[in-house]
Swiss-Prot record:
The lineage of its organism: Bacteria, Bacillati, Actinomycetota, Actinomycetes, Mycobacteriales. Its EC number is 5.6.1.7. This is Chaperonin GroEL 1. Belongs to the chaperonin (HSP60) family. ATP binds at residues 29-32, 86-90, 413, 478-480, 494.
C-alpha cells in the first residue's frame, strides 16, 4: 500500500485541522447551557447527545492527515473516560487549546523539546494545585450536587446519591432501561467480581460494550475446561433449552472456547465465559459463595461431580448478568435469602476465628460482596432516543459521584482551572526561554473550559475568564444562574479525579503532537475518487 508523507509545518497543520474539527464538535456541549449534537447511527434512529466521548468516538475524517489529529484527540477523551468516566469534553478542549497554542509558538520558531519541558512542569504544578484545592465529599447532598452537575438533571442527581448511599462508594451501581417513563432506583441482592469476558466476541450489547444475559443458566466449574468431548453434552442441553449461558471456570481454552465463540458469532447461543477470580483457597471459597448466590452446584471432580456426567441440575441462575471487559455483575441470583444469610454468618465466624490479618481482610471482602447488594437505576423516558441520552447522562453521573467520593471536589465551571492558570503565570517566571513559553501555553489552555462554558451560555468568554481569575478559591461564574458566587456552596463542583485525568491526558497528547516532524498515512484508494466523478453539482 503506497503511503503519503507530510513534513514539518504541513504535518502539524494537517493534524491541527483534524484536532479542531473534532474538538469544535464536542465543545458546544460544555456547561449547563451547552447544546446537543445529533449523531447518525447505522442502526436505529439518530442519537441526540451532549456526552463528549460518545460524540468523539463517532467522528472519523475523510482527509487522512486531518484524521490523525482527530484520532489523537479522540484518544484523550476515551482515556479520560476510562479512568474517570466523565470530564471528556474538558479534556478534549484542553488538548485542542494546548496544541493550538504550542503549534503557534513552534511556527514562530520555539524549540518543541523545550516547550514540552515547560508544559510538563506546568502540568505537575497544576496537579499539585488541584490536590491543594480539593475538599472532601462526605454527605449525600454533596454527592447529589456532583451527580446533578454531571447529568444536568436534579432527579438523576438525587437518585445517584441515594444509590451511592445504599451500596457505599465502592458498591456496584448499574443502569438498565425501565419499562415505564419514570426513572427509579431499586436495590437488589447481587454480587460482582473483577473478571470480564474471555473473548470480545461474547459482547451482545454494542452500545455499552458488554455481554448482557437475562435469566441465564449459570455453570460453575472448579477446574479448566479444555476437553470438548467432556463439555459438549452439557452445552447441547443448554442450546436445546434455548437459555443464555454464563460459564465461570478456572479457564476455558482450546476447542471448548473456539466452540463457544463460533456459536456466539452464529447466534446459536448467547454465552459468556469468564475466568474465576483469585487463586487457591480464595478462589475455591468465592466459587462456593457464587454457588449459593445463584443456586448452582460447583462442578468439581474432588466431590465426585465430573463435567462429562453433569446434567442440568448443576445450573444456577439469576435475573440478569452483565459482563464487561473487566467486571461481572450478577443481579438477583436464584439462591434463597436464608442460605445467603447462613453463608454470611459462616464467613463472620471465620473472621472472628482467624489470627492472620490477610485472611481476615480477604474474608471481610467476601462478606462485603455478599452483603453489598447492587443498586439498579432504571432509566425511563418517553422515547427511545431520550432513554439512550438519559442513560449516558446517568452513567456519567455515577462515575462523577464515585470520583468525587474518592478524591474530593473543586469549584466547577472551569473556575478552579482559571485560578490555577494565574498561579502558573507567576510560576513561569522561574523558567527561561521556551520552557517559560511552555508553562504559559498551559496557563492559556486552562482558561478555555471556563471560556466555552460562558460562550455556550451566550456571554463573552474572555470577560468571564478575566473576572473569575481575580476571585478567591471556590468562587466563580455559575452558568446556570448567570451569576458570580461561591460555587462550592451553590453545588457547582467537579470531582478532582476527573479534572486531574483531563489535564494529564490532554498534556500528554499535546506534547506528542508538538514534537511531530512528519506524518505518514495510507494513500486513499483511486476507485473512491472515480466513484464521485459523475456527481458534480453545478
Amino acid at each position: 500500500m503506497a503511503k503519503l508523507i507530510a513534513f514539518d509545518q504541513d504535518a502539524r497543520e494537517g493534524i491541527l485541522r483534524g484536532v479542531d474539527a473534532l474538538a469544535n464538535a464536542v465543545k458546544v456541549t460544555l456547561g449547563p447551557r451547552g447544546r446537543n449534537v445529533v449523531l447518525d447511527k447505522a442502526f436505529g434512529g439518530p442519537l441526540v447527545t451532549n456526552d463528549g466521548v460518545t460524540i468523539a468516538r463517532d467522528i472519523d475524517l475523510e482527509d487522512p492527515f486531518e484524521n490523525l489529529g482527530a484520532q489523537l484527540v479522540k484518544s484523550v477523551a476515551v482515556k479520560t473516560n476510562d479512568i474517570a468516566g466523565d470530564g471528556t469534553t474538558t479534556a478534549t478542549l484542553l488538548a485542542q487549546a494546548l496544541i493550538a497554542e504550542g503549534l503557534r509558538n513552534v511556527a514562530a520558531g520555539a524549540n518543541p523539546m523545550e516547550l514540552n519541558k515547560g508544559i510538563a512542569a506546568a502540568a505537575e504544578k497544576t496537579l499539585e494545585e488541584l490536590k491543594a484545592r480539593a475538599t472532601e465529599v462526605s454527605d449525600t447532598k454533596e454527592i447529589a450536587n456532583v451527580a446533578t452537575v454531571s447529568s444536568r438533571d436534579e432527579v438523576v442527581g438525587e437518585i445517584v446519591a441515594a444509590a451511592m448511599e445504599k451500596v457505599g462508594k465502592d458498591g456496584v451501581v448499574t443502569v438498565e432501561e425501565s419499562q415505564s417513563i419514570e426513572t427509579a432506583l431499586e436495590v437488589t441482592e447481587g454480587i460482582s467480581f473483577d473478571k470480564g469476558y474471555l473473548s470480545p466476541y461474547f459482547i451482545n450489547d454494542n452500545d455499552t460494550q458488554q455481554a448482557v444475559l437475562d435469566n441465564p443458566a449459570v455453570l460453575l466449574v472448579r477446574n479448566k475446561i479444555s476437553s470438548l468431548p467432556d463439555f459438549l453434552p452439557l452445552l447441547e442441553k443448554v442450546v436445546e433449552s434455548n437459555r443464555p449461558l454464563l460459564i465461570i471456570a478456572e479457564d476455558v481454552e482450546g476447542e471448548p472456547l473456539q466452540t463457544l465463540v463460533v456459536n456466539s458469532i452464529r447466534k446459536t447461543i448467547k454465552v459468556v465465559a469468564v475466568k474465576s477470580p483469585y487463586f487457591g483457597d480464595r478462589r475455591k471459597a468465592f466459587m462456593d459463595d457464587l454457588a449459593i448466590v445463584t443456586k448452582a452446584t460447583v462442578v468439581d471432580p474432588e466431590v465426585g461431580i465430573n463435567l462429562n456426567e453433569a446434567g442440568e441440575e448443576v445450573f444456577g441462575t439469576a435475573r440478569r448478568i452483565t459482563v464487561s471487559k473487566d467486571e461481572t455483575v450478577i443481579v438477583d441470583g436464584a439462591g434463597s435469602a436464608e442460605e445467603v444469610e447462613a453463608r454470611r454468618a459462616q464467613i463472620r465466624r471465620e473472621i472472628a476465628n482467624t489470627d492472620s490479618t490477610w485472611d481476615r481482610e480477604k474474608a471481610e471482602e467476601r462478606l462485603a460482596k455478599l452483603s453489598g447488594g447492587i443498586a439498579v437505576i432504571r432509566v425511563g423516558a418517553a422515547t427511545e432516543t431520550e432513554v439512550n441520552d438519559r442513560k449516558l447522562r446517568v452513567e456519567d453521573a455515577i462515575n462523577a459521584a464515585r470520583a468525587a467520593a474518592q478524591e474530593g471536589v473543586i469549584a466547577g465551571g472551569g473556575s478552579a482551572l482559571v485560578q490555577i492558570a494565574e498561579t502558573l503565570k507567576a510560576y513561569a517566571e522561574e523558567f527561561e526561554g521556551d520552557q517559560k513559553v511552555g508553562v504559559r501555553a498551559l496557563a492559556t489552555a486552562l482558561g478555555k473550559p471556563a471560556y466555552w462554558i460562558a460562550s455556550n451560555a451566550g456571554l463573552d468568554g474572555s470577560v468571564v475568564v478575566a473576572r473569575t481569575a481575580a476571585l478567591p478559591n471556590g468562587e466563580g461564574f455559575n452558568a446556570a444562574t448567570l451569576e458570580y458566587g461561591n460555587l462550592i456552596n451553590d453545588g457547582v463542583i467537579d470531582p478532582v479525579k476527573v479534572t486531574h485525568s483531563a489535564v494529564v491526558n490532554a498534556t500528554s497528547v499535546a506534547r506528542m503532537v508538538l514534537t511531530t516532524e512528519a506524518s505518514v498515512v495510507e494513500k486513499p484508494a483511486e476507485e473512491a475518487a472515480d466513484a464521485h466523478a459523475g456527481h458534480h453539482h453545478h
